[in-house]
Amino acid sequence: MKIFKIVKLGLLSLAICATTTSCNDWLQVDTEDSIMEGLLFENDEGYMSALNGVYSKMNELYGSTLSMGMLDVMAQYYNVEANTNHSFYNSAAFKYDQAGFKSTSNSVWTSLYLYIANLNTLLSHCDDSNSKLSKLYRPYVKGEALALRAFFHFDLLRLYGPIYSAETENTIVMPYQETTSKEIQPLLSAKDVAAKIMRDLNEAEELLKEDRIRKDGVMNGDSDDPNDKTAFRYRNFRLNYYAVKALKARLYLWLGDKENAYNEATSIIKLNKDEGVFPWTRKNAVTST
């Protein structure tokens, strides 16, 4: 859905300007960041803190703007357009040139790429030859980080890219940021961005194939066993194995590949039936005090 292209060139210009600040400024920031990174990625808990930090930041966009806020308004779920004084009027009326809409759109673009930048830093430490990340934590940390990176790029593609088709797949739309480099990455076609999203999701699925959720369920509560780490519980609140497969189904559907979308979706349904991971909510769970 090509809804925000009006602001994209301006945002890229800002990014280029940011890379041309003085060397002293960059040196100071780099030094401080390197020290903080060294401390953060000293153990498994530090890696989990970095990953959880991205999940926490998501609330800033997905708590409203990219859920029940601006996007739902643009989908005409609310009767807003009739009231020209409404704070969401510009979104409802598709007035993309208005300052308020531009400001929100800029925030979406920059925030999503900021989340991606943090994930890339985390991923670079996962793959470092001197990584302190244990074999137990690595599939979860790296798998979820890759899935989140794909998820954010997919939202950027849906929002700023074209309505996908054979005629538009080669439209140049956006960069796929997959390194910690401050260099502006080349703009890619919608087809190439989608391919990189699928690549990240496939790798995430492989890493998470032994996700505890498949054997133990969502584990939606703390354990009495002191050796049962909380980091591996509450799997329904994270991009777990099933969520990655569901995201692949969404991507296939967006690309118009209904056969693979169907195959991914039905595989999740079958897996849940066989493994019983997501039971129906019992009445007393929502009515008891």
Feature map (PLM): residue ranges:
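Bacterial Sec-dependent N-terminal signal peptides
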Residues: 1-32
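Membrane-proximal, proline-rich intrinsically disordered regions
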Residues: 23-72, 265
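Inward-facing hydrophobic residues that define packing positions of alpha-helical scaffold repeats
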Residues: 51, 116-119, 194, 201, ...
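Conserved, well-structured interaction surfaces
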Residues: 86-160, 183-191, 206-208
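Alpha-helix C-terminal capping/termination sites
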Residues: 155, 159-162, 217, 222, ...
